[in-house]
Amino acid sequence: MKKIVLLLALSIFFFKANSQEIPRFNPDTIKTIQLDSVVVIKAQRLNVERFINAIINDTSFYQAFRNMKKFSFIAENRIYTYDKNNKVDGKVYRKIKHNNDGPYKMEYLVKEDNGKIYKKNGKYQLYTVEMFDFIFMNAYNTDFVPNAPASDGKGGTNESYKDKLKTLIFNPGRPIKGLPFIGGKTQIFTANMRQYYDYTFYSGTYLDSIPVYRFKISVKPDLSSWTKDGLMIKELVTIFDKRNFEILGRYVDMKYSNMLFDFDVQMNIEMSYFDEVKLPTKITYQGNWDYPFKKEERASFLVVHKDYKLARGK
């Protein structure tokens, strides 16, 4: 479980932008946003503080995952693993029907595995894939209060780790206690950390019809190499619905290296509306991570949720 928590600390967050990507096969070909111009934003009297406060105080993003239990839907999950030359050496494809009409049922419509996916004991080769299953297959079966104090671990080791996992995903900007060497590096909205980042915001259109703001936080280009190397979050992009200022998407680009581990990851989560309820529609991940005495892990995910239908009696 500790290894899963560490991995997730290196791979959270959200929304594809013009950042540095790992040069290999990318399963995500779904384009969702068209940008307009920064000029439109200035006329709206918006400022950086309003966007940051919205990110810190938002609860709707996690609630969208909680809302999934009220719906039946189809999930298509694709996982790719890579060798040291970034050639695909393993594939997983799952098409799953999640049925919440009455007692919850999960039906595999398609289940395909190719290449080096499992160990001899039947467990996944990569902690990356194990993390993926643990978090996103169970996202709407857990409780989470974004602004609650960090867990003291009294609920048991596993429960403490789960609290950290959920905080990393759904409440960016908070420090994560109990994760050595990187727990404080997620706290990017402090006065000290803000001096290292540029902030820009644009107007755009999401899914061809939803008017949105795109708020981007990125490392200043004129910093020294030493300073840049010490900043874990290279870029954080958040998509806001103009009509209600709720968050529809998040993207993060993270890279960090020290004596204990080395990672380079990008992750994206997107939402949409079904019967006026916000629900997750796409999750993507590209990442490499490495730590001593273990094989370097290289993987990408594409998760698409579709055909949401309100479950009977929900």
Language model features by range: what are they?
Residues 22-212, 217-226, 297-314:
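Structured extracytoplasmic
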Residues 8, 13, 27-29, 204, ...:
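Residues embedded in well-ordered secondary-structure elements
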Residues 186-192, 208-313:
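Gly/Pro-enriched, hydrophobic low-complexity segments
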